[in-house]
Amino acid sequence: MVTRTTKTAGRCVIVGAGIGGLAAAAATAAFFDEVVVLDRDELPETAQHRRGVAQGQQLHILLKGGDTFLELLLPGIREGFNRAGACQVRHEADSIHFERGHVFPQRDLGYIHLGLSRPAYEWAVRERVRRMPNVVIHERRSVDHANVEAGRLISVGGTGDQQPFTEDGDLFIFANGRNGTLAQFLTKAGSGVVPTTELTIEVNYTTGRFKKAERYKGDNTQVVCFPGPPHRALGLLFPIENDEWLIALGGRGNERAPTDLDGFSNYAASLPFGAIADRVRDAQLVGPLRGFRVPSSTWWHYDRMPGFPRRLIPLGDSIASFNPTFGQGMSVAAGHAVALRNALAMSSDSGRGLDNCAEHYFPKALELTAQAWNTAAMGDLEFPETQGRRPEDFEKRLAFSEALRRAARKHHEVHKLRFEIAHLLSPVSAARDGPLAALISAELQPSL
């Protein structure tokens, strides 16, 4: 991995102060004289929800890969998470994992999950980034357009505190979420249409924050209930700060968890595994239950865009928005930021400066995007109502996924590898070609 940093004179402008934008600030600070982060929200001084993160009060998971990427960018950030009150969960010794009719063995795979709410993760990262001497975060600045001249992005503009503003820069990073605004800006600026891949998934989920019943105080067990097709319901329970739980119940299409407590509890009881219902029964709801709908997942293929402007880097959900059930968004964004840091170092070495930063960035960023996208898409495409192109070898991939699942239940080392792939620590190829491939292949026969 490239880690050398050579200072590049100039100014970097980042749109979005969520996990992706903050990670990008950490990645770029060593290369620029000034890094400016713009966000439309007023950012809270504590670990509080903010309006601009529409699903910020839903359950968010920082995968172990995301935790690792952030530690690379901000050494010591894990201690920051601990100071924010993170619950330490041993994967998978502290996990009750029900999937497709089977409960996985509770094995210690050698990894610790630091469980927090999304606002607490973001607050811990933001406080670190604020202390960087050449990084400034401007709140209440809503970007509504980008200016492109001679094939290069030269500025962004919008409204801040009811006044128009323009920000010039030498490099622009868009990390402003899953709404596709960057693609719209580029089309309006005359750069063309961004090719996209879209899956219509119609995922619904309801999340509540709960104080634990007395018998569960201090218990950091997490619960995962993925029944799989044909069942459309699922449940997740994760411990967070203040000895509380975030509990999310979800479904597809018309299958949705109610937003009243009795209905929510009954929905939990309807799951084919009772660990979540048992915990909800005596827990105390803190605040309202909130329901959300995610109609689709989208991948914007900026790398295939003939008119893609120089000096522009899309990052995180600006490249791909995933089914949130799989908890990949924050971690992919952090991985993109690591790819950006390495791309800046390579651009400096190339002698071409920032003009070829994107061509160094895209290969690694898109490799990570593809792994996350394919994991989520395979789960989505198993449901016949999901609209989107299925790969020609779809049935073969499903058979391999089932073989990996069975082998993981049987073998500790395969269980660990499956975890590492899901958490973006190892590539999928490690299951097909690595030293454990024979154990997985041995499980293929029953699928044929």
Predicted segments, located by residue:
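N-terminal Rossmann-like FAD-binding beta1-loop-alpha1 element of flavoenzymes
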Residues: K7-D39
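Membrane-embedded alpha-helical bundles of multi-pass transporters/translocases
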Residues: G20, F31, V37, R78-D94, ...
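N-terminal FAD cofactor-binding segment of flavoenzymes
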Residues: A27, A47-I96
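Short beta-strand to alpha-helix junction loop
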Residues: I61-L62, D108-E127, T181, P258-T259
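Helix-loop-beta segment of a Rossmann-like dinucleotide-binding subdomain
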Residues: E99-R118, G250-R252
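FAD/FMN-dependent oxidoreductases across multiple families
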Residues: G115, D243, E255-H360, K364-E367
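C-terminal helical "tail/cap" subdomain of flavin- and related membrane-associated enzymes
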Residues: R341-L448
